């Protein structure tokens, strides 16, 4: 499970970089955990080069014995050498099956930990499903493995003859699964008679802060979008003992805001806007697996009495991930002539048409949906001897499960 968390973190940061490149100044909110766990359902039926590309993009090739490239005996010693020799005697098919099983078993365990919080801690509403053209006919073995590892099964729809009705059916299913939060995920024209397979992934997060923000200090305050523009936004205020740190090389503060239930939001805020866009260019360029783990560790963070001001906001972002995943290296899965999903269907023309993703979050005083209300313009920024965290310009944020160290959500707030 630890290896899978590492793989998911790598995927999350790589995905963020790709989305940042195509949306240099816009708000971003995605659930890389939800995306990777849904793509794993497709990976379950992928074969040959399609499987290899997906494994690299999702970083599944970093898990256990998935990389089946023969090793050099000089690199093995003692028990490792004996295990390697013994492993070389196994048929490749058995090794591959064991490696795949380890990935999907880890997802099952990780999903159980993340998706079943203690009563009242937080809420994750998600809808994840693979919809395929009914003529493809999914293999019974694939259906059973989907049920075993992911508690779901693919659904056959009639894209060929009734594409728009299939779209409405998918939207209706998503609306029901998310209790009305996401009523129209697939827009008109998003599927047609050539559509073979669509992956739907939506997630909605509601959490409660461990220490709620002060409502009485809500009010309008200028949020600097860039060097030349500001927009009014409601700000929230909190004074509390929190983990806070400073990344000197990037002139960036990092703050941990805990939710109830082993979930935290980590915010990364540059001191000032020092580029021509959001002020986040250098920070976004330097984010990688090693740096991120260092930034959120005790090596960087210390508890202090912190004065916090952050905007009150709600983000509901829609993405069609096909071009992004293709740029990351997952090409064959979307290619009619190259895709190999023979593990899920006997049909040789099955390919992934699109991956639709929507993630929604509310950030407010309670940490969940709160009643409206206005108050005084933000005050009280002086007379405090401890550190201040004033998010009145663009910042990045990560919502993480602290037990599994899994990044559930990644966001960039650049404009109200």
UniProtKB/Swiss-Prot annotation:
This is Plasminogen activator inhibitor 2 type A. CDD domains: serpinB2_PAI-2. The keyword Cytoplasm applies. PANTHER family: PLASMINOGEN ACTIVATOR INHIBITOR 2, SERINE PROTEASE INHIBITOR, SERPIN. GO terms for cellular component: cornified envelope; cytoplasm; extracellular space. Glycans are attached at residues 23, 228, 262, 402. Belongs to the serpin family. Ov-serpin subfamily. It comes from the Eukaryota. Inhibits urokinase-type plasminogen activator. It is found in: Cytoplasm; Secreted, Extracellular space. The record marks 381-382 as: Reactive bond. It holds the Pfam family Serpin. Disulfide bonds: none annotated. InterPro entries: PAI-2, Serpin_CS, Serpin_dom, Serpin_fam, Serpin_sf, Serpin_sf_1, Serpin_sf_2. SUPFAM superfamilies: Serpins (SSF56574). It comes from Rattus norvegicus. Keywords: Cytoplasm, Glycoprotein, Plasminogen activation, Protease inhibitor, Secreted, Serine protease inhibitor, Signal. Its main location: cytoplasm. GO terms for molecular function: serine-type endopeptidase inhibitor activity. Interacts with PSMB1. One of its GO terms (biological process) is negative regulation of apoptotic process. The signal sequence is not cleaved.
